[in-house]
């Protein structure tokens, strides 16, 4: 955003007092803040602790404001819970204050409350982890940290959806003024959900073939959830017998796509 020279501010406002450097610091921030995540790729069906870090932007957050991390509704990701810290799929939220500029007042927020709502936002991002702020504001540069599958209390984490997905998105929203009007925090968090290690092989081919014609068969490796494993050019040895006698034998390599 364009910065106004100090002389122009003085001319427009007259004499005023503000912490030195606060204007420049906040003008350098994205207005609605930014989000980051500790993972970029996870295995389908695995247990994880996923940390979402929201750094408040120049807008700050007023008393009673909200923050949401949302997901598409159609997923078999295990449902989050907020009541049993030592159990699976526990989700938590905490506040981290950023350093103050000399003369700047610290944030006054007293506590955060986190909840999970399967239809806590608009389609298609309906599943929502919602953080409410209470009894005070948060200043620009502060952090709200959400842990999906918080393991600090002995829980196993959160069970990821069991099917692979390229560019799984977590879209975050903030209501900075506490008016229940949300704006997206760009860009989205993007995670690659990839297959696990091969657990079984699957054949695919026609049930009917003419006499004397070759029968094409395709073989693929699947993980424990039935996802096709890619980027694993494993060596496979194929043999076939008829009446106890070998009729076919071949060594091949699975493609990496």
Regions picked out by a protein language model, each given a short descriptive name:
Residues 207-210, 253-257:
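Alpha-helix capping and helix-loop boundary segments enriched in small/acidic/polar residues
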